[in-house]
Amino acid sequence: MLQYQIDRIDHQIADDRSQTGTFLIGPLERGQATTLGNSLRRVLMGGLEGSAVTAVRIAGINHEYATIPGVREDVLDILLNCKQLSINSSSPDLEIGRLVASGPMDVKANDIQFSSQVEIVDGEKPIATIQEGHNLELEIHVERGVGYRPVDRKSEETTAIDLLQIDAVFMPVKRVNFTIDETAVAEGGTGRERLKMEVVTDGSTSPDDAIAEAANQLIELFQPLATVTMVEEIPEEPEPSPEAQIPLEELNLSVRAYNCLKRAQVNSVSDLMGFSYEDLLEIKNFGSKSADEVIDALERIGISIPQSRTSV
C-alpha cells in the first residue's frame, strides 16, 4: 500500500475570524485522490457537529414581524444577526446567553453574556443599534447539532409565544474545494496523484481539526466492513431527511433559476434530489450557470446530485 502524507501549506484568518486552510495530500495512486477528496468533502460539509443559535427571546416581543421602539433594526434583522453568529459551545446541553443594554449603544456579539462553556468567535459581529433613552433585553439559546435543523412548528417549544425559533445551521465548515495534480510517474509506468484541498470554516473550529474529525468519521464508517457478517434484515422505509424538506425559497437562488424551477414543478429540495446535472440542463431556459448555482446551494446543506442519469 502506498504511504502518503498530508501537509498544510497555507492558513489564513479573515476579519470575521473565519479560517481557511490549504492542504496537500500525496502521493496517491491514480483514482485515490478523487475517492479521498469526495469522501472528505461530503463529511466536512454535512457530517461535523457544530453550535448554532436556535431561538431568541426579546422582551416585549411575541412575533418576528414586530419592531422594537428605539432600536434601528427590526426583529427579523436581529434574528438574522443572531443566526449568523459563529459560536463554539462545549456543552452538550442547551446554553442560554443574556443581554441587557441601554442606548445609545451599538450592540455587538461580545455584549451577550454566556457561560464559560460558550465562545463567541467573532465578537465584533453587530446585533442591534439602540437609541438614547431606550433599552433592549435579549435571551439567546445555543445548542449543538449536525447539519441543518428547520423549525418544527408543531413542537412544544414553539408554543411559547415569546420564544422566536430559528432554523439552525450547525455546519462549522463553510466551503470545501479540491483539485487533483499529477505527480511523477512511478516505476512500472503508474501515474501518481496529489490531492490539494482548501477548507474554509466559520472559526468555531480550525481546518486542521475539521479534516481530522472528518477522517475519524470515515474510519468509523468503513471499519465494520473489515469483518463483514451476513445478517438478514427486514428493510425499513427511510424517513425523509430534514434537508429534503427545505422549500425552494430558502436556497436563495437567483430569480431566473427560481422561476425556471418553479415552472418545472420543483418546490423543495426533495424535488431537486430526483434530478441529475444533465436533467437540470434540460429544463427550459435553464443554462449551466443556473445549474451550477443549484449545485452550490445544495452542497451548502450537505446534499449532492449525480452528474448524469443512471444508466440502465
UniProtKB/Swiss-Prot annotation:
* Keywords associated with the record: DNA-directed RNA polymerase, Nucleotidyltransferase, Transcription, Transferase
**GO CC term (a single one):** cytoplasm
Among SUPFAM superfamilies, the record links this protein to: C-terminal domain of RNA polymerase alpha subunit, Insert subdomain of RNA polymerase alpha subunit, RBP11-like subunits of RNA polymerase
Reply yes or no: does the keyword Ribosomal protein apply.
no
Q: Name one Pfam family in it.
A: RNA_pol_A_CTD
Q: List the residue ranges of the region (Alpha N-terminal domain (alpha-NTD)).
A: 1-229
MF terms from GO for this chain are: DNA binding; DNA-directed RNA polymerase activity; protein dimerization activity
Sequence segments annotated as region (Alpha C-terminal domain (alpha-CTD)): 241-312
Q: Which GO terms describe its biological process?
A: DNA-templated transcription
Catalytic reaction(s) noted: RNA(n) + a ribonucleoside 5'-triphosphate = RNA(n+1) + diphosphate
Give the enzyme class.
Answer: transferase
Q: What is its EC number?
A: 2.7.7.6
Keyword Transferase on entry:
yes
- What information about domains appears in the record's comments? The N-terminal domain is essential for RNAP assembly and basal transcription, whereas the C-terminal domain is involved in interaction with transcriptional regulators and with upstream promoter elements.
Per the entry, what this protein does is:
DNA-dependent RNA polymerase catalyzes the transcription of DNA into RNA using the four ribonucleoside triphosphates as substrates.
**Subunit text:** In cyanobacteria the RNAP catalytic core is composed of 2 alpha, 1 beta, 1 beta', 1 gamma and 1 omega subunit. When a sigma factor is associated with the core the holoenzyme is formed, which can initiate transcription.
What's the family? Belongs to the RNA polymerase alpha chain family.
Protein name as it appears in the record: DNA-directed RNA polymerase subunit alpha
